[in-house]
Amino acid sequence: MAMAEGERTECAEPPRDEPPAEGTLKRAEELKTQANDYFKAKDYENAIKFYSQAIELNPSNAIYYGNRSLAYLRTECYGYALGDATRAIELDKKYIKGYYRRAASNMALGKFRAALRDYETVVKVKPNDKDAKMKYQECSKIVKQKAFERAIAGDEHRRSVVDSLDIESMTIEDEYSGPKLEDGKVTITFMKDLMQWYKDQKKLHRKCAYQILVQVKEVLCKLSTLVETTLKETEKITVCGDTHGQFYDLLNIFELNGLPSETNPYIFNGDFVDRGSFSVEVILTLFGFKLLYPDHFHLLRGNHETDNMNQIYGFEGEVKAKYTAQMYELFSEVFEWLPLAQCINGKVLIMHGGLFSEDGVTLDDIRKIERNRQPPDSGPMCDLLWSDPQPQNGRSVSKRGVSCQFGPDVTKAFLEENQLDYIIRSHEVKAEGYEVAHGGRCVTVFSAPNYCDQMGNKASYIHLQGSDLRPQFHQFTAVPHPNVKPMAYANTLLQLGMM
């Protein structure tokens, strides 16, 4: 999710030789006050706009950068947030909020050691601040955990959780009245019962969950990194974007558009989990349908099907709360086998993030990506999961701090080289649930309405018909869900108001 295109101004303007006049300073303060009001109203795009105007008038005020950094954090523009926080500290090394903001930005980017250094600075300056101490201690735990994971990775990196499971010996207790696989297989009856069971806020038995995970891993590992699908003229397929643990909105998609079947195929374009607090329900439902219709129900990996994101934004915590740490490890293994892209009739390419940091990438290059891993910090795999379009030509540094932003000329050149018509991607919330950019060559679809219970956005899904492949957009709005807030299982730092 991110702010609208074209709103960004540079983070670090060069200081002026002469200080601004008193009237200019007064106007800058008025703009900051307006920005603060927009921020309180959760209108972060306008908050950023007015903070930026204040900075233009007075580029030496650390508070303006600190405030805009927080607004960027709320819109998931972590790269911009990091730049603003760093600039605030450069302007005023005693501005403690600058260190808080920079730590939050680095946490969001998975740069835990860098975050720890800033939390340490805050604790030294404010040794009696309980909030600062708690954040420092929590971040320190993560750094130590990561160090431990690296230490044991050499011995166990390729050892599968599956090897240590004995599913057959797991007993389903007599008092459990929920859905069970029939002879170890997913059926349509099981799936209907499962969705109702989840709708009633009940938990699937761990044996059934493990059965689904082990079986879906077997299915996914046989797929190509680039899935290629042919639609006949009379056939259609539905493409959905981010669902982010919003299970009741997922049910609404199936209510509006029909359950998956061999005649009603789906593609879900990544970011199934995190943020929403029903991520386990979402992902096991999607995996169940993948087992039921392996050739007609498609799942692509998003940037949130990764360990770093799951550790921060809730999925790891949710699986541990509802099941066990071992089950989360198996989820992580399964996520590594999710394909990265899908091509329809050789003309429409679908991926979660977008296009590439370098020219000349071909479909064959995508096919050759070894996806069974955590994504690197750069390169084609990273770009497919993380990049975003921009309105201006060329490429620029990513607002997220990962991968890049690519312009209409980049999209046009990629499509021409690969004989494609357009791309479909997700990865960003859009007010109307979708966006058509780059002269119709870059389509964004987002399927989590009222994202995180606060954005107020519509959501959408796309129909593609084999006869012409023109995208047909279908919008929908959020439905009620049980009183469990988003991020309920997120990292403690997030719950403490890190962002």
Curated annotation (Swiss-Prot):
Disordered: region residues: 1-23
Pfam family, one: PPP5
Phenotype upon changing K97A: No effect on phosphatase activity
SMART domains documented for this protein: PP2Ac, TPR
Tissue-by-tissue expression: Predominantly found in brain and, in lower levels, in testis, but was nearly undetectable in spleen, lung, skeletal muscle, kidney and liver.
Listed EC numbers: 3.1.3.16
Cofactor note: Binds 2 magnesium or manganese ions per subunit.
Taxonomic superkingdom: Eukaryota
Active-site residues (renumbered): H304 (proton donor/acceptor)
Outcome following mutation: K32A: No effect on phosphatase activity
TPR repeat ranges per the UniProt record: 28-61, 62-95, 96-129
Activity regulation, per record: Autoinhibited. In the autoinhibited state, the TPR domain interacts with the catalytic region and prevents substrate access to the catalytic pocket. Allosterically activated by various polyunsaturated fatty acids, free long-chain fatty-acids and long-chain fatty acyl-CoA esters, arachidonic acid being the most effective activator. HSP90A and probably RAC1, GNA12 and GNA13 can also release the autoinhibition by the TPR repeat. Activation by RAC1, GNA12 and GNA13 is synergistic with the one produced by fatty acids binding. Inhibited by okadaic acid.
Region spans: Required for autoinhibition: 495-499
Effect of substituting R74A: No effect on phosphatase activity
CDD domains: MPP_PP5_C
Location in the cell: Nucleus; Cytoplasm; Cell membrane
Keywords: Acetylation, Cell membrane, Cytoplasm, Hydrolase, Magnesium, Manganese, Membrane, Metal-binding, Nucleus, Protein phosphatase, Repeat, TPR repeat
SUPFAM superfamilies: Metallo-dependent phosphatases, TPR-like
Biological role stated in the UniProt entry: Serine/threonine-protein phosphatase that dephosphorylates a myriad of proteins involved in different signaling pathways including the kinases CSNK1E, ASK1/MAP3K5, PRKDC and RAF1, the nuclear receptors NR3C1, PPARG, ESR1 and ESR2, SMAD proteins and TAU/MAPT. Implicated in wide ranging cellular processes, including apoptosis, differentiation, DNA damage response, cell survival, regulation of ion channels or circadian rhythms, in response to steroid and thyroid hormones, calcium, fatty acids, TGF-beta as well as oxidative and genotoxic stresses.
Subunit structure: Probably forms a complex composed of chaperones HSP90 and HSP70, co-chaperones STIP1/HOP, CDC37, PPP5C, PTGES3/p23, TSC1 and client protein TSC2. Probably forms a complex composed of chaperones HSP90 and HSP70, co-chaperones CDC37, PPP5C, TSC1 and client protein TSC2, CDK4, AKT, RAF1 and NR3C1; this complex does not contain co-chaperones STIP1/HOP and PTGES3/p23. Part of a complex with HSP90/HSP90AA1 and steroid receptors. Interacts (via TPR repeats) with HSP90AA1 (via TPR repeat-binding motif) or HSPA1A/HSPA1B; the interaction is direct and activates the phosphatase activity.
UniProt similarity note: Belongs to the PPP phosphatase family. PP-5 (PP-T) subfamily.
Protein name according to UniProt: Serine/threonine-protein phosphatase 5
Species of origin: Rattus norvegicus (Rat)
Gene: Ppp5c
